[in-house]
Amino acid sequence: MLTQPYIDPVLLHIAGPFAIRWYGLAYLLAFVLFWLLARKRLQHQPFARLKRSDGSPLWTMQAVEDLLFWGVVGVVVGGRLGFCLFYQPMHFLTHPLEILYVMDGGMSFHGGLLGVTLALFLWARKRGFGFLQVMDFIAPCVPTGLASGRIGNFINGELWGRAADPSLPWAMVFRDPAAGGIARHPSQIYQFLLEGLLLFGLLWWFASSKERKPGEVASLFVLGYGLMRFAAEHFREPDANWGLVLGLSAGQWLCVPMIIVGFALWNHFRKA
């Protein structure tokens, strides 16, 4: 059995409430990794050959950086509002200013997905790109960012797992008193491996091995994430405000429509 290593969530105190936190650096790393992977993605088909009416390339690093800015806004705003709405609505209703305390942790993937989808839909319309094409482009670049976020969760000592058999070699006692001082699954690491590394490997191989039909890559991301998050949630401590509903956690219920819609869309686009 292991004990969670102590890492101060604050890397550097600046002045007053201002500080550099590991959680914030995890998000910065996520965006840097996206930028690096997007450079490689430009070499994949059909993006490498697409042209504008004047013969200039449609997909360029300038377009990617513009897209990334819109995506960052969508992820941060959607992720934070999603966490407040899905997991702790009453708390943030009575403490609305705490919605702004993003660096203290508390982001929702499902909220971030909705936020970035809306932001990139608007970006695609404004810049003259096909929405499905945009989502196919970004999908393989996303899981490494999810992996970075889970490392941030681990350092913060949040979102720990359910009680585990103390004889499990990697069972861990988390330092947060709310964790009860008992052996638990390090569910952040499970999610790092499943939603991060495994999903990245699957999507990058699928997207780069040959040209795919429009919508195939994006829908596989929705399906793959839904399945892997659903599985990982089995080991994660249910949210205190939700508990289990019909045996499923809040995260699992949010994954159910992703799995259904993702499978339906992937099957549709694959046969198109």
Where are these regions (language model features)?
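Hydrophobic, membrane-interfacing alpha helices
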Residues: 1-272
